[in-house]
Amino acid sequence: MLSPVRITVTGAAGQISYSLLFRIAAGDMLGSNQPVILQLLDIPESRKILDGVVMELQDCAFPLLAGIIATHDPMMAFDQTDIAILVGARPRRKGMERKDLLQTNGEIFRNQGKILNQVAKRDAKILVVGNPANTNTLITMKNAPDLPAENFSGMLRLDHNRALSQVAMKLNQPVSNIKKMIVWGNHSSTQFPDLYHAEIGDTKVINLIKDPIWIENYFIPTVQKRGAVVIEARGLSSAASAANAIIDHLRNWFFGTADGDWTTMGILSDGSYEIPEGVIYGFPVICKNGMREIVQGLEINPFSRTRLDAAYNELTQELDSIRHLLP
């Protein structure tokens, strides 16, 4: 039997975690032979709910679940963690400006970065889900300078999956047939779901759709605004689909992307595609042996260029508003 992997999940009493934890414990993320220890963190006010979640996890009798720690102490939750999934963040309330959300959540992620720096395993992988995810990833990473920058990523996989789904429905194709989708930029309404490189078999998706008006006026805004539409329909934000995206993101990170395909991750920009260094930006990446690498050499047409730049400009504005949270 393999040694258990310690997985920290913040916001563990919340909606996304309720859809996530049972799948992790069942082996959906790391496989059917990998035991896990769940280290669950939430605020003291959520303790009763978290206790209920723990009871349900116990009652499932998962063979792979080697232990559960439930706490409001981040030092305990992050201690010797192998994987940290940072879901917990305050939601945007009515009347709250985006800058207010950046400030409130930025302080949470600054503190968590500092604690990760102290007690997490040195090769721990950290996935930031709580919004605004890109900038929260940067805050966490900068406050954990002893951990490798390449071990931090922000989640754009939900956006990536939404884009795949829209194309699959448009072309009446299985999602699994669609390769090389990209969502550039920020996990926000400036993101750019880019299907100019996407393929089904050896055929470009744009040559199958043959409808630039659908792409510009339906596909792109539908993916950009999908989260808000789900909230309007459900009265609650995306939870099961976000949990599924977390599973997909981490499976690719650990086990690799399929040959001839890539995925989207929010990672530290390095100058690729004329996006200046220093922000967490959605790029197409190939994963192999636990590492990820930006796909290089893709042609960026003028239509795409303006959208890549708009996302970068928004990220620099976010960065300017939280510089005081960086060491």
UniProtKB/Swiss-Prot annotation:
This protein's record includes keyword Repeat: no
Residues that hold substrate according to the record: R92, R98, N131, R162
Protein name: Malate dehydrogenase
Alphabetical UniProt keywords: NAD, Oxidoreductase, Tricarboxylic acid cycle
Catalytic reaction equation(s): (S)-malate + NAD(+) = oxaloacetate + NADH + H(+)
Record organism: Nitrosomonas eutropha (strain DSM 101675 / C91 / Nm57)
Function: Catalyzes the reversible oxidation of malate to oxaloacetate.
Tagged with keyword Zinc: no
A matching Pfam family: Ldh_1_N
Class of this enzyme: oxidoreductase
Gene Ontology process terms (BP): malate metabolic process; tricarboxylic acid cycle
InterPro entries assigned: L-lactate/malate_DH, Lactate/malate_DH_C, Lactate/malate_DH_N, Lactate_DH/Glyco_Ohase_4_C, Malate_DH_type2, NAD(P)-bd_dom_sf
Binding site for NAD(+): G11, A12, A13, G14, Q15, I16, S17, N105, Q112, V129, G130, N131
Active-site residue list: H187 (proton acceptor)
Cross-referenced CDD domains: MDH_chloroplast-like
Molecular function (Gene Ontology), one example: L-malate dehydrogenase (NAD+) activity
Superkingdom: Bacteria
Family: Belongs to the LDH/MDH superfamily. MDH type 2 family.
